[in-house]
């Protein structure tokens, strides 16, 4: 089915059809593989939808329960043909026997009627009774009694299975899916693809009555015309004669969703300015909708397609009109009286003309819009569908169909054929959908019961929503109806002299006898089922059924209803014949385009794209070859411009508007998954493939031989194996297992990811459905593993690494492997020690430092571990991968970093932060050392300024035993190494007034052990008069090297007679700075803040300036004073003695 009432916006020059749906009825056949394709898909009436049901079904438990007597089936010789593949180009032969005729023999039993009704597996034993003709009362014969309490029919076992079968319907139902047709979307392809259609009808000719004809069953098989003659004679045949009719083989059309517009038909108001004379018809044709065989299968819904291409003269103005006429024997809608024609539109959907339809004259009048005022050289196209008007053609006949656009006519001769009844023994029935009311959602079905006027015993007709196969089997089809107590069912008897129209459509029921009240009608026979009990009959009857249907989605019609006739044959077995009708839809289309400039005579090129299954480059050499739709075909003009179309459902493409003498290039895009077939595989230019690109020159005619073929590109696989390479040799060993859940990524040659998978429990992986080409395979390293070495041996046994390239060239590639081994773990660390000798080396006597915090960072600077040294100063970090790390030592409080990198790496200190790289081994060389600051070294800075002018009278008794060894070098730069052992016990009472300013700088490194007790009382800047009596026993050994810068002014008056009045004025400038490093720490007082370039503190003179001369004077003065004191003490000692 093509576009339905769609308006597409495409390029100006293109052609597109504007579609509109209509309805038709179709006799349905199930089990065939026929497909209806063409420019439009006609909906219709379907029958025999489950024709091959018995070929595919099996006995079920329900069938066994429903059968107690032997069931002898007669299967026709065409049973195997029902599932045979249908060739679209070969029609089915006429008068073939159908497998749908099933004969169920009923064995006599002793059961009563009540038993039959209560037990589905029991049948009564009775002999056939004689039935009078024209007896329409319901039969009470036990043999033919139908149990109306059961909903569905029992499925009959095929192939002469011996089963006892009653006439009681069972609960088993055949599920059959009919084959659906393809739907064409190419609006320019007016040639429908033919499909097998049913032929050979068997009905009574109302216009040619004849005498009764006696004919045997064999004669009917061999001479189908005998059956037609039998129907037309309307005679009573011998009861032993069993007419056989060919089961229809028409296709089951695809259900179509379509937009449907209906309106009450009104005569077209033809505008006064008809411009038919300004319309130039360039092409028009009449084609058959199903099969181009000259036969219209009217009951199969076969439609007539009228296409017309025409040009609109530039003189046409808005408001002008043109006409399109249908043949009087056709009608736009088969089962409705309402029809609105499609609009003529351009490719963009803009309306060129709007139409109205006159049902009385069967003429469309199109009125042009202002489109014709705005564009020149407007081209238009119409595609109209119609059906045989059964009112005008009640019986089979030959017709000359004539259609016309703007009074330009075209004709085609066709033969109209109608359906024949389905016959099984005395059961013979046929039906059609005769009317559709989309407003009330009602459908009318007209059923011919016993149209052959056979002597039918115990006749029952069942009407069912859904499908009924020719053999009477029920199935779920393409649609449904609602059958309940509100369903209208009328029964009419056909008099012996009356003829039934072969069209199966009754326009005036009043001409037949209404016997509705003379038969038993059960409208609740089952779910959506009704039953009519006719009893014994030998006349034809018409049943009119008006049932409701439930509409589907927008414009979606799926209406299907079947009927089944059941009779008792001469063997007291039930015989069934079934018929099914279905409603589908079809569309009309109209389209056009406009061009700016007039064009010269133009030509077209194109033809066909097909799937070349056998790859030989020749069309039609393999039955599986088929057309390829939607293949992009590009036309390149001489000036380099291009335009493209896609192939339709029939593989057809076409470019029009081409100029004579010009050269064009046609290129075919290779569909995804296909490859171009062999070029020029034969000398027949109509059958070969021209390749992906072909150049053609227009030589005064169309060229419709530019074909190309493609075949499906073969698909391949790629992959193999991921394993644990325990021995790390890069070779797959037999005892090495696969690794599960390894992620593998596949990329194409452009780097695009086209697939991802994981290895299975065996380590296997694969990628499927791949084309030839180059691919990249990437393996993700599993957690805890390391890639093994790659490319060590044969391609199928080595490791290809983490990333590898796989090439597919007309074969699978199973060589892409990757191996991994479990990643080892490493440790790092060592030692933090107390470097007592500060040499930056670990000595055997030096001990570790406990509780030093050590931090480990990874290459990104992230902390991955922290620990503390143990009591031996040891630390370590474990479970480390190879990589770069940083170790950070936190300096202990009160300690100083020792020197780094002074000796071997495992014995020196590496400092507070150490970068380390682990490569497949532990690293225990990361050490660090610290030492303690020597705060016991005496650092004495003394600044004393003493200015004394005193008169001191001192009486001192001093007993001193002192052993002093002093080596002192005092200058601005002094280095003193003193080792003294002094034991002093002195009692000194000194009252002195001293003004002293001394600057002493001493830098000494000494190791001393001293015990000193000093009591000093100093009053600076004092004037003291002391009278001192001193008795001293002193032994002093002093080695003093003193360089003193002192300024001493001494005025001393000494009386050697133990009475000494000394007036001493001493000015001393002394700066003493002592820096001592000793094992014993003694606190010292700070020196003055002023120091020289040797870092010696200096005292400033009171004047604020430095005076070396004054210092020297002080030195000498001090010496003299000392000598004087010695003399004085010595004299007094003598006196005392």
Swiss-Prot record:
In residue numbers, the region (Ligand binding A region) covers 53-601
The residue ranges flagged as biased composition, category Polar residues, are 77-89, 158-207
PROSITE patterns the UniProt entry points to: GRAM_POS_ANCHORING
State the signal peptide span: 1-52
Q: Which GO terms describe its biological process?
A: cell adhesion
Q: GO cellular component annotations, sorted alphabetically?
A: extracellular region
Q: Provide the CNA-B domain boundaries.
A: 602-714, 715-824, 825-935
Where is it located? Secreted, Cell wall
Q: Which UniProt keywords apply?
A: Cell wall, Peptidoglycan-anchor, Repeat, Secreted, Signal, Virulence
User: Which branch of life, at top level?
Assistant: Bacteria
Q: Where is the composition biased (Low complexity)?
A: 109-126
Q: Which residues carry this modification: Pentaglycyl murein peptidoglycan amidated threonine?
A: 1103
PANTHER family, per database record: TOL-PAL SYSTEM PROTEIN TOLA
Name of the protein this chain belongs to: Bone sialoprotein-binding protein
Origin species, per record, is: Staphylococcus aureus (strain MRSA252)
């Amino acid at each position: 089915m093509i576009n339905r009432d769609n308006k597409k916006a495409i390029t100006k020059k293109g052609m597109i059809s504007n579609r509109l749906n209509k309805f038709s009825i179709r006799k349905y056949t199930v089990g065939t593989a026929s497909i209806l394709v063409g420019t439009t898909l006609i909906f219709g009436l379907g029958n025999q939808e489950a024709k091959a049901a018995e070929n595919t079904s099996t006995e079920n438990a329900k069938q066994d329960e429903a059968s107690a007597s032997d069931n002898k089936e007669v299967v026709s010789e065409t049973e195997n043909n029902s599932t045979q593949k249908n060739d679209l180009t070969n029609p089915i032969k006429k008068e073939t026997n159908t497998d749908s005729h099933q004969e169920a023999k009923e064995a006599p039993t002793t059961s009563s009627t009540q038993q039959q009704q209560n037990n589905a597996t029991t049948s009564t034993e009775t002999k056939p009774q004689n039935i009078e003709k024209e007896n329409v009362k319901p039969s009470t014969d036990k043999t033919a009694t139908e149990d109306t309490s059961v909903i569905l029919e029992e499925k009959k076992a095929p192939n002469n299975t011996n089963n006892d079968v009653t006439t009681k319907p069972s609960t088993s139902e055949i599920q059959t899916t009919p084959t659906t047709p393809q739907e064409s979307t190419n609006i320019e392809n007016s040639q429908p693809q033919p499909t097998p259609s049913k032929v050979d009808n068997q009905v009574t000719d109302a216009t040619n009555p004849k005498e009764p004809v006696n004919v045997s069953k064999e004669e009917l098989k061999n001479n189908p015309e005998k059956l037609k003659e039998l129907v037309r004679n309307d005679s009573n045949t011998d009861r032993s004669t069993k007419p056989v009719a060919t089961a229809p083989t028409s296709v089951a059309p695809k259900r179509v969703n379509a937009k449907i517009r209906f309106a009450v038909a009104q005569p077209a108001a033809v505008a006064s300015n008809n411009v038919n004379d300004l319309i130039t018809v360039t092409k028009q044709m009449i084609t058959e909708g199903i099969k181009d065989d000259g036969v219209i299968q009217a009951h199969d819904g076969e439609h007539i397609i009228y296409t017309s291409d025409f040009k609109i003269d530039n003189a046409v103005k808005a408001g002008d009109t043109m006409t399109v006429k249908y043949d009087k024997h056709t009608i736009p809608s088969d089962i409705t009286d309402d029809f609105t024609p499609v609009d003529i539109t351009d490719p963009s959907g803009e309306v060129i003309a709007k139409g109205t339809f006159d049902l009385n004259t069967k003429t469309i009048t199109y009125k042009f819009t202002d489109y014709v005022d705005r564009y020149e050289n407007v081209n238009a196209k119409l595609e109209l569908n119609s059906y045989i008007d059964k009112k005008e053609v009640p019986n089979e006949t030959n017709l000359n169909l004539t259609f016309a656009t703007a009074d330009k006519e075209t004709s085609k001769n066709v033969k109209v054929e109608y359906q024949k009844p389905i016959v099984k023994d005395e059961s013979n029935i046929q039906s059609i959908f005769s009317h559709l009311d989309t407003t009330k959602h009602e459908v009318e079905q007209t059923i011919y019961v016993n149209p052959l006027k056979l002597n039918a015993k115990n006749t029952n007709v069942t009407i069912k929503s859904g499908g009924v196969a020719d053999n009477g089997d029920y199935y779920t089809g393409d649609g449904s109806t609602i059958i309940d107590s509100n369903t209208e069912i009328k029964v009419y008897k056909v008099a012996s002299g009356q003829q039934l129209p072969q069209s199966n459509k009754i326009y005036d029921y009043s001409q037949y006898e209404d016997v509705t009240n003379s038969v038993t009608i059960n409208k609740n026979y089952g779910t959506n089922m009704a039953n009519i009990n006719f009893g014994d009959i030998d006349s034809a009857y018409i049943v009119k059924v008006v049932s409701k249907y439930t509409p589907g989605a927008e414009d979606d019609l799926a209406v299907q209803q079947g009927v089944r006739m059941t009779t008792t044959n001469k063997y007291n077995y039930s015989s069934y014949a079934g018929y099914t009708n279905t409603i589908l839809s079809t569309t009309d289309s109209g389209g056009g385009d406009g061009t700016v400039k007039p064009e010269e005579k133009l030509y077209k090129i194109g033809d066909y794209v097909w799937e070349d299954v056998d790859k030989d480059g020749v069309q039609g050499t393999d039955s599986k070859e088929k057309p390829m739709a939607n293949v992009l075909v590009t036309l390149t003009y001489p000036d380099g411009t291009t335009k493209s179309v896609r192939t339709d459902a029939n593989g057809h493409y076409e470019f029009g508007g081409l100029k004579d003498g010009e050269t064009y290039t046609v290129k075919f895009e290779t569909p995804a998954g296909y490859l171009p077939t062999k070029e020029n595989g034969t000398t027949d230019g109509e059958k070969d493939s021209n390749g992906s690109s072909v150049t053609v020159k227009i030589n005064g005619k169309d060229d419709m031989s530019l074909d190309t073929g493609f075949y499906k590109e073969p698909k391949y696989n790629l992959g193999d194996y991921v394993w644990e390479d325990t021995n790390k040799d890069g070779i797959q060993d037999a005892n090495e297992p696969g690794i599960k859940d390894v992620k593998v990524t596949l990329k194409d040659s452009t780097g695009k990811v086209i697939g991802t998978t994981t290895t299975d429990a065996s380590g296997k992986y694969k990628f499927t459905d791949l084309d030839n080409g180059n691919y990249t395979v990437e393996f993700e390293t599993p957690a805890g593993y390391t890639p093994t070495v790659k490319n060590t041996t044969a391609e199928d046994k080595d490791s290809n690494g983490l990333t590898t390239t796989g090439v597919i060239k007309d074969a699978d590639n199973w060589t892409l492997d990757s191996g991994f081994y479990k990643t080892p773990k490493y440790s790092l660390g060592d030692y933090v020690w107390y470097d007592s000798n500060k040499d930056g080396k670990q000595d055997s006597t030096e001990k570790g430092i406990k509780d030093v915090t050590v931090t480990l960072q990874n290459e990104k600077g992230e902390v991955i571990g922290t620990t503390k040294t143990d009591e031996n100063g040891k630390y370590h970090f474990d479970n480390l991968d190879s990589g770069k790390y940083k170790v950070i030592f936190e300096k202990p409080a009160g300690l100083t970093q020792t020197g780094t990198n002074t000796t071997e790496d495992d014995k020196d200190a590496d400092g507070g932060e150490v970068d380390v790289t682990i490569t497949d081994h532990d690293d225990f060389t990361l050490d660090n050392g610290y030492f303690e600051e020597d705060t016991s070294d005496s650092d004495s800075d003394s600044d004393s300024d003493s200015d004394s002018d005193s008169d001191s009278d001192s009486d001192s008794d001093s007993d001193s035993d002192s052993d002093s060894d002093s080596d002192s070098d005092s200058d601005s730069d002094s280095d003193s190494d003193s080792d003294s052992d002094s034991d002093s016990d002195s009692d000194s009472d000194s009252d002195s007034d001293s003004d002293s300013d001394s600057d002493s700088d001493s830098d000494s490194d000494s190791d001393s052990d001293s015990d000193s007790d000093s009591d000093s009382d100093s009053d600076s800047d004092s004037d003291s008069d002391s009278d001192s009596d001193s008795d001293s026993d002193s032994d002093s050994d002093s080695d003093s090297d003193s360089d003193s810068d002192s300024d001493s002014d001494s005025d001393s008056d000494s009386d050697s007679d133990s009475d000494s009045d000394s007036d001493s004025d001493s000015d001393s400038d002394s700066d003493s700075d002592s820096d001592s490093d000793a094992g014993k720490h003694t606190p010292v007082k700070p020196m003055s803040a002023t120091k020289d370039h040797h870092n010696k503190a200096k005292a400033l003179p009171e004047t604020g300036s430095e005076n070396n001369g004054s210092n020297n004077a002080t030195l000498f003065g001090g010496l003299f004073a000392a000598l004087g004191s010695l003399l004085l003490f010595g004299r007094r000692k003598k006196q005392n003695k």
